């Protein structure tokens, strides 16, 4: 169609599967514009995109894990993204709790009985810790969610889950034949690319963080005498603290091994060790933390996230391209993940304070260029591990 416009005129184009009366379209369009957020800064764009990931219905709100093919309401993705999409985006504690409450109701099976995401239920701890730091309502939050977290911890007791077992040394052993039981869960021809059966470094780091947090909260706000939870799990916490570092730390290599299977230590330098040093409760000594951060900085950090595998490893694949099989082989064998920058930057600020500010700015400023390119308001889940990414 064509139209002649004079200065000051406007035209509204409306598409519909049904014929509609054009009268009132201009008013509807104007009303729609008024409801839209003003996007003037990069932060405005990120906040707007955060809002797009919230799937709101009359009785619940869930998180879409990613456009265009990931599902809505996934356990790990919701737990990890929830503080950023709510608390740090708009400060909405009510929305945070609404989404979390829906997730807990939806995910009873994975949270308390069985899951192929062995560490995901334990990551609820980190989400609650962030909520406490943001709101300052420690007692109130523990009163509401404490039973849920304690139930999750209890579900890792011996004999409760098929996919993970707590050993006498307090550590969690994860194994199911031909099944990937961590976030590194790509498959090729029906077989996991990174199976990682045994003691996984990040799963046991999340385990220790959960135990320490729950025990401390129960000591503060639980029963003061004969607290069965504290009495049962304090010795386990101490066992994990005692055995974690000897199991995973290699002083001669300067990093924590990725997983251990019957005494064999996987030598791959991966970002999973980051969670052993960045969580509120760390199971390793300060000297180990410094060495681990140094190794991660030297081998994994890029301007688009942390690589999933060091380029020095012969299995490293630095470019995500080719067939679906080629891409699945590269997915956790070298691709850089932006989400891993957050815990890395967090631990670096803890160690170096404001002296790390310029470096943090350098590591994040590149994403603002991408916001105006590929995703239009968002950036990618992963990037090539090789420059220019």
Map each language-model feature to its residues.
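Beta-strand-rich interaction surfaces with strong enrichment in secreted/lumenal proteins
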Residues: 1-3
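Extended glycan-interaction surfaces of carbohydrate-active proteins
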Residues: 5, 11, 18-20, 26-73, ...
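Aromatic-rich carbohydrate-recognition surfaces in CAZymes
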Residues: 76-78, 82-181, 185, 200-204, ...
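An alpha-helix initiation/capping motif
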Residues: 118, 147-150, 227, 231-242
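Inter-helical turn/loop segments and adjacent helix faces that build the functional surface
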Residues: 131-144, 213-232, 287, 351-354
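Aromatic- and glycine-enriched pocket-lining scaffold segments that form the walls
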Residues: 155, 199-238
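Conserved small-residue packing positions in alpha-helical repeats and bundles
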Residues: 208, 215, 274-277, 345
